């Protein structure tokens, strides 16, 4: 009997199931998820927090979808151990699940930095539905929330909380918000937009200590160039990065570094065992955005269907979007010009519009579009195709329609 077992019920796992389709070769597929609710679209947690959507709306598959694909989803029951020799998975409830092929899709958890008091049970990450539930449960008595980390998730969390009527302070150690995707100009536009929404943005600021009783956070000490300050706050949300969930793989003797090590076919060092998503590591890279995980799922599904001739997984540049209504920001590739690079930019800061292209050898290697993202996908296509833009270089910054009209 051919059985596929997938550890994890997140977006990576379900993308593999979608790619496998109905006519897969397995007699049975078992998916083990430690959450008690069916798979949901984690990308939509920010709109959910902002009360702009519902859990039902972001739950893509019903029971019938799984049944017709011979998939058993085991909810609320994590994995205790993987026995590689016996090819068997043991769950926390005591179930023993034999497998022919095993996929680690265990995802990641919020990385909480070593801040005094950050181990308080009331401290929250922003990764799961339970994190959103924990925030919503506090709304009745919640006056002020502090979000630590102004990367993509931190900005989304801050806006979501503000839309729920909570006063929010957003702390970021770097002087540039979303500093992995934005330059200083784009950051200043984002900061102004957040301030217009009533969010107190503090760049160059770090948490020092959290204070509270056994039930709740009460204060947070922060430090910046201006010195130390104490804020009254009832909720602290850390959005300071992620840590891959690799413990099961480590215990099973599977090779790991920061993540579970895989090759270009998503295979681990152990035959019949694969990994993808935020728990895996390929070519010294780990993952936090969904686009590369979709690529991995497509490759893995083909390999599981015994198509060893499938195109191997390759790193490629992806488009990053800020998923906050009213804030349009797209970032692709290099947002600062390195050696040999040129920059073309235009801006209207009074309107919150900024466009920047980074070029090297007459090819686009980076794009920033803020406020007006109309042409970002066109730029992305040119960049992905490695197109020579020398003939339209002088017009390129004005977008596709202008270039086509002038041609």
Where are these regions (language model features)?
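Beta1-alpha1 glycine-rich phosphate/pyrophosphate-binding loop at the start
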Residues: 1-72, 160-181
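Mid-to-C-terminal Rossmann-like scaffold of FAD/NAD(P)H-dependent oxidoreductases
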Residues: 2-3, 22, 279-377
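Short hydrophobic core segments
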Residues: 6-7, 97-109, 231-241, 297, ...
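Residue-level detector of alpha-helix initiation sites
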Residues: 11, 36, 108-110, 130, ...
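A Rossmann-like FAD-binding core segment of flavoenzymes
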Residues: 26-28, 73-90, 97, 164-262
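Glycine-rich dinucleotide-binding loop and its adjacent helix/turn
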Residues: 106-164
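FAD-site-proximal beta/loop scaffold in flavoenzymes
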Residues: 119-142, 212-221, 229-302
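Cysteine/selenocysteine-centered motifs that mediate thiol-based redox chemistry or coordinate metal-sulfur cofactors
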Residues: 135, 318, 389-407
């Amino acid at each position: 009997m051919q059985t596929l077992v997938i550890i994890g019920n997140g977006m990576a796992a379900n993308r593999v199931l979608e790619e496998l389709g109905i006519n897969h070769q397995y007699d049975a597929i078992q998916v083990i998820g430690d959450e008690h609710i069916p798979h949901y679209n984690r990308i939509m947690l920010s709109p959910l927090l902002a009360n702009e959507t519902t859990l039902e709306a972001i739950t893509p598959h019903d029971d019938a979808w799984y049944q017709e694909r011979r998939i058993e989803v085991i909810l609320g029951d994590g994995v205790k151990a993987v026995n590689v020799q016996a090819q068997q998975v043991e769950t926390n409830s005591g179930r023993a699940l034999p497998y022919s092929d095993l996929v680690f899709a265990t995802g990641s958890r919020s990385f909480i930095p070593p801040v005094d008091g950050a181990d308080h049970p009331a401290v929250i990450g922003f990764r799961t539905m339970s994190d959103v539930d924990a925030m919503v449960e506090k709304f009745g008595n919640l006056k002020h929330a502090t979000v630590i980390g102004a990367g993509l998730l931190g900005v989304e969390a801050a806006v979501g909380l503000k839309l729920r009527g909570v006063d929010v302070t957003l702390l970021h150690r770097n002087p540039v918000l979303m500093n992995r995707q934005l330059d200083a100009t784009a950051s200043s536009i984002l900061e102004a937009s957040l301030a217009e929404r009533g969010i107190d943005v503090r760049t160059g600021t770090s948490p020092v200590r959290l204070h509270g009783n056994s039930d709740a956070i009460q204060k947070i000490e922060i430090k910046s160039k201006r010195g130390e300050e104490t804020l009254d706050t009832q909720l602290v949300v850390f959005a300071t990065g992620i840590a891959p969930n690799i413990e099961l793989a480590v215990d099973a003797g599977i090779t790991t570094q920061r993540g579970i090590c895989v090759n270009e076919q998503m295979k681990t060092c152990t035959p019949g065992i694969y990994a993808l998503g935020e728990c895996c590591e390929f070519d010294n890279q780990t993952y936090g955005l969904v686009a590369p995980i979709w690529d991995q799922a497509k490759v893995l599904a083909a390999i599981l269907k015994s198509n060893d001739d499938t195109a191997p997984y390759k790193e490629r540049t992806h488009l990053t979007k800020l998923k906050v209504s009213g804030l349009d920001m797209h970032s692709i590739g290099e947002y600062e010009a390195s050696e040999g690079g040129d920059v073309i930019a235009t801006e209207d800061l009074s309107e919150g519009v900024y466009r920047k292209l980074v070029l090297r050898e007459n090819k686009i290697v980076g794009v920033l579009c803020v406020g007006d993202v109309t042409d970002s996908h066109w730029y992305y296509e040119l960049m992905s195709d490695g197109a020579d833009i020398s003939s339209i270089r002088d017009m390129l910054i004005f977008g596709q329609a202008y270039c086509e009209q002038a041609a």
